[in-house]
């Protein structure tokens, strides 16, 4: 969108879609980060990473930046935070994680969250 507004409408986008905020035609896009784009609000993301006590990396190759660098940022700026990789297989960032749990996210994530909620995790 030309106006940079975010609209929460659930509509099918076409080349003729009109922005409800500025009226621009054909400039709408989904509110996601495409491959090769930089996410908005990186300062806020880094600040949140520096405050975290538990960092989970779920279902990622760990190779696409800037997200691939988040675990290193946590290790450097939030050294007391626990880092956990939940993935199908090890990534290139594997040495940066305190714990590794491999398997389908549909299985390992609920099991890990259950452990956390039951107090059966190390910090």
Language-model-detected regions and their locations in the chain:
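Conserved catalytic alpha/beta core of Sir2/sirtuin-type deacylases, generalized to analogous enzyme cores
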Residues: 1-123
